[in-house]
Amino acid sequence: MNKSITINTSHDRQSLLIILSDPKFVLPKLFPPIKEVEVENDSFNAHGRFMAMSFNMHGNVLRGADLVYAFYLSAGGGMGQGKLTMRIKEREINLEFEYDGWMERMSGIFFMDRWFSGFARRLDEDVRMERIKRKI
């Protein structure tokens, strides 16, 4: 499954890099079924429920020219892997999601489109509030 979206924002690149490199900020906002995120250094472990099934997502945040969330997703014996890439420019974010695994059948285009459009619609305000909270 591949999904990409371009998001326009009023925030500068440096502030976006700081906030969007935090899995506790990004993951629950992009994937609403995620209810808990634990972070240790550049690794994350997220838990949630989707369609009555508990799942676990674990991976790493790679920081370079792009922000990359490389992850494994598991639930009830099913496994998948994916990558979320954020190309952050001044006032614009190109978001690319790639995933191959068991959840592809369940989440499909309907949920992913809804989640991504909701993330894009709310991002500017969510980042604004997070900048206030963190004093960035």
What are these model-predicted stretches?
Residues 13, 62-66, 86-94:
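A short, structured loop/turn motif at beta-sheet edges
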Residues 71-125, 132-134:
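Beta-strand/loop substructures that line and gate deep hydrophobic ligand-binding cavities in soluble
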